[in-house]
């Protein structure tokens, strides 16, 4: 699990206290979703070439995608593809916490390559949703020289997005 591994590494630098909150718990106006784990995901053409590969970018899979192992033509796959038409090599970020679905986020050029593919496409998402899982949260209190307190809140749950994630911790 990438989040827990990140926290383990950060614990080497900062004395973090880790707390677990069970999936399904209501926190104010939010419900903690099931714990999601992904091991691999790809779209291969009929020749066996991986056109889209989770191992090249973890943004390629819609976060919280359900597991799938399918053979589809492009027309059937199209509703599960997300791209930004005006941006050739940009991979969009999508998630589906509360709606059971699956999908891939692809560059425009990958989309066009899939569209040109002849024959069936092989779609695999090796993932799991665990209703009995949990969300790990870290906290740390750094004593200051006055009685004033400041709360700094940050997160890193959206993969590979430096502008709004791990950069906030650093």
Locate predicted features.
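N-terminal hydrophobic/helix-forming segments and targeting peptides
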Residues: 1-170
């Amino acid at each position: 699990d990438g989040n827990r591994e990140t926290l383990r590494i950060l614990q080497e630098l900062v004395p973090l206290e880790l707390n677990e909150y069970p999936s399904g718990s209501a926190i104010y106006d939010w419900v903690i979703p099931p714990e999601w784990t992904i091991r691999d995901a790809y779209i291969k053409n009929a020749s066996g070439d991986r056109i889209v590969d989770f191992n090249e970018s973890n943004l390629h899979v819609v976060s919280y995608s359900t597991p799938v192992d399918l053979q589809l033509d492009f027309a059937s796959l199209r509703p599960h593809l997300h791209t930004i038409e005006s941006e050739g090599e940009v991979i969009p970020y999508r998630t589906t916490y509360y709606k059971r679905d699956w999908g891939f986020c692809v560059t425009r050029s990958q989309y066009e390559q899939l569209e040109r593919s002849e024959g069936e496409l092989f779609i695999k998402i090796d993932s799991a949703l665990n209703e009995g899982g949990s969300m790990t949260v870290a906290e740390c209190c750094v004593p200051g020289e006055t009685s004033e307190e400041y709360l700094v809140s940050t997160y890193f749950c959206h993969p590979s997005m430096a502008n709004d994630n791990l950069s906030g911790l650093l």
